[in-house]
Each structure stands twice: as C-alpha cells, then as structure tokens.
C-alpha cells in the first residue's frame, strides 16, 4: 500500500484522477530522487491501470490482477539495461516499438515501463521518439528517471511530467520513528539526499558511523599544512560510492557556517574549519566537483590516488 510511503500520495492522487476519467496520456514521465520508493508507485499504478474490474484501483482477484501479482502479465513490459550501469540500447527500444503496435492480449491497456529512461543512448532515444509521436490506442509509456536532464528535450516535451518530491524533514523523521528509529540526527537525511528509506538503511548498516569517522579524519587532515592525509584518502577509496558526496555536503555546510548560517540538517563538522576562510572552502569544493565529474566520466580511475591529489590541494587552501 502507498501508506507505507506517504510522500508518494500526492502524485498518486493526480494519477488516480486520470484513471477515473479514462484520460491517460500516451506517455508519462515520472521523476524522483533515488531512494523514495518510487517502485511502489509504479506497481500500484500498473495494477490499477490493468485491472479489469475497477478504474482507479486493483481489485486483486480478476485474471489481470492475478497475472500482475505473479509478474506474468502479457501487457506489462519492462525495458531496463541488460546489465547494471549499461545503456538501454536501440535494439531494446525497437523491440518495444514493435510490441506497441500489437493489440492488447487482454483487451485493455498495454503498459511499457522504461527504467531508468535516462540510460537510453542517443539512438534508443530517437527510436522511442518516433513511437511517442504516434502512440497506439490504449498504449502507455511510463518513463522513470532520477535525472531528467539527461533525457532528450523532445522526449520530455511529449510526456506528462510528474515529480515525486522528497518528504519534508518533519514527515521523514516521523516516518522513521514509525519504523522504530527513535534517535535519528537530522543531518543523516542530508547525507542520504532527503530519503528516509536510505537514511534508515544507513543507520542499520553503519554508514552513518562511517561518515562521522570520515568527517573526523578529513577535518584532522585539513588542520595543519603538515597533517597526514593518507588515512583520509584510504577512507575515501574504501567508501568510494559515498565519500565524494560526503565531502561535498561537508564543504558546502562549512561555507554556510562561515556566514553564520545555522540549519537543522547542518553537519556537525561544518563549524570546525579554520574561520574566515570562505575562499579556501569554495576552492576546495570547486576542485571536488571537478574530481566527481572526472570519476563519473572514467569509473576505472584510481580514486585513492586522485583523492590524495585533491586532499593535498585542499590542505593548502584550507590551512592558508
């Protein structure tokens, strides 16, 4: 049920209006940050759309609902990268386009879920565009993305756009309390992009403790021109999926602290840098953005070595 993730309700309420009036566009673009449980919304929507008895909810017992529950519905198609981290190819989209020209096997809607839509390469995007321009009757494309800027503008313009907004801090904290997490620092949400689901996972798997260890090590490494940075570089390599984001959040909060800004989600180490050195913090953050772009473009690079170079540069500007 969507009650599990109440922040999904506003988008569902709008989708439900379209289902009840049978005014569903040929293409929907569903956007959210990662970790907001959007897969639950997709499941809920697909079951309601394909149900043979009710217009805006799944009855749970018709033939279509039973097929959906067993993941064998012939009119529900998922288009995903064949391997994690790879692109959705033009051949996959062409196969999807051919299916879109066929009739529904259960005389209802046909639903094509493309996830993540931003992983389509250029050829795949262009192939899909032709189908979106002339969608078949009772044929719906649901494009799911965490980064809509990577989609072709022409594709975005042909979709009805819905955004799942992260819950407010108050709503997220309340949800985590309901899950049994009573003592959650507000800054944990920031480290997890506002996602209470990811924050809860971070608390349970030790990621929050790992961040605090990184924060202490980084601040110590930036405390004097002669400080050792090797431990911090090793930690960054060990937590390669998170450390660059951790450093970014810490530096941006530290810049705010230089101007006396205080926020509920501010990281505890933000006030521990050398005072009156906004320019140094800005320079370090700018170099970090360049490093992040480099690592994203070339995933095979040695992060520990690159982190070492960045830490040396940061130490110079933060200790000056």
Model features per residue range: what roles?
Residues 56-88, 149:
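AAA+/P-loop NTPase substrate/partner-engagement loops
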């Amino acid at each position: 049920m969507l009650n599990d993730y109440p922040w999904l309700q506003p988008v569902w309420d709008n989708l439900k209006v379209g289902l009840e009036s049978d005014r569903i566009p040929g293409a929907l673009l569903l956007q959210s940050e990662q970790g907001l449980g959007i897969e639950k919304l997709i499941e809920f929507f697909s079951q309601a759309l394909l149900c043979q008895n009710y217009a805006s909810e799944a009855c749970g017992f018709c033939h279509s609902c039973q097929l959906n529950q067993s993941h064998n519905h012939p009119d529900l198609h998922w288009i995903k990268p064949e391997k994690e981290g790879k692109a959705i190819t033009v051949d996959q989209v062409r196969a999807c386009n051919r299916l879109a020209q066929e009739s529904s096997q259960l005389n209802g809607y046909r639903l094509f879920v493309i996830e993540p839509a931003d992983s389509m390469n250029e050829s795949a995007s262009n192939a899909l565009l032709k189908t979106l321009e002339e969608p078949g009757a009772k044929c719906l494309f649901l494009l799911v993305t965490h980064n809509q800027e990577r989609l072709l503008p022409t594709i975005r313009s042909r979709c009805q756009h819905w955004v799942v907004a992260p819950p407010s801090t108050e709503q997220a904290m309340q949800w985590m309390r309901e899950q049994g997490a009573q003592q959650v620092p507000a800054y944990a949400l920031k480290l997890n992009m506002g996602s209470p689901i990811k924050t809860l996972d971070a608390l349970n798997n030790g990621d929050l403790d790992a961040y605090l260890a990184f924060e202490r090590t980084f601040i110590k490494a930036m405390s004097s021109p002669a400080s050792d940075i090797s431990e911090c570089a090793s930690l960054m390599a060990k937590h390669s999926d998170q450390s660059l984001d951790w450093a970014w959040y810490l530096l941006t909060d530290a810049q705010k602290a230089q101007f006396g800004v205080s926020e509920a989600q501010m990281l505890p180490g933000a006030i521990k840098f050398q005072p009156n050195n906004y320019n140094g913090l800005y320079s370090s953050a700018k170099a970090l953005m360049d490093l992040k772009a480099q690592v994203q473009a070339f995933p095979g690079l040695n992060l520990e070595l690159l982190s070492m170079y960045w830490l040396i540069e940061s130490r110079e500007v933060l200790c000056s």
